[in-house]
Amino acid sequence: DVDLRISTIPTLYGESVVIRLLERSQIFTDLSALGFPNDVLGEFSAIIAKPHGLVLVTGPTGSGKTTTLYAALSKINDPAKKIITIEDPVEYQLTGVNQIQVKPQIGLTFANGLRSIVRQDPDIIMVGEIRDFETAEIAVQAALTGHLVLSTLHTNDAAGAISRLLEMGVQDYLLASSLLGVAAQRLVRRLCLGCRTQRALDPLSARDSGLQVKNGQSPVTVWEAVGCDECSQTGYVGRIGIFEFLKATPEMCNLIVQHKEAGAIRSLAQTQGTRFLREDGLEKARTGVTTLAEVLRVTR
């Protein structure tokens, strides 16, 4: 089955139409298929298995946030758990999950819907997007009162999600007490294995891109798209995520309570060994999963 999301707008020379294809058979419901590095996959899987707390996935529109949340729900879905989602719109139907679609015309907004959901005795709540203070406040309160809450934000990186919630007006001590972790992501095109080619990168380009010589390898090598019949001459087949994951450690929570800016949070994350978006992307470029150009395109 294929669902279509259609947007039209009148322009000077006629209608501009955008059609988004949602192919149910192609949705990834396995976290390990999304592109998480093994260590990040382990950390992310551990926090979504917790009984309560707030888990956020952040990134721009079209970066795969909803797919990641669906995969997370599929992993923790269990007949003994009551899972309720509120989305705009419901993109895919999940077996065993109570899914609600917002409808502002009748007053069913994220905030009002979430307020009703917490009275339904759920174990796990997924909020499609935190757009305002009211939704953020209810989500945090739900996470503090024994529910696992998963949601998304539109920010450039994981640290920015924390700053955004504080700027919305969420109390710092409540956020520090409820937050489990934040994952940031982008989507890059995956190289066709049938025609990709390897080339040496000159030292200047390697330095500018952030690629370093690894394990005595010299010069740095990357992969490029070519095109063949298998990939319809595009050089790419499908897409894969690049990720960064920020775990809410005690030190991180101290910064939240102090209302520190995203830069300070990012610096602490770096000292704690967090792999940022570009670093994960560069590793995928080095190993031939995608191209250097793709990584730079989505992380600039």
Predicted regions and their residues:
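Short, flexible helix-loop junctions that flank or precede catalytic/ligand sites
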Residues: 1-300
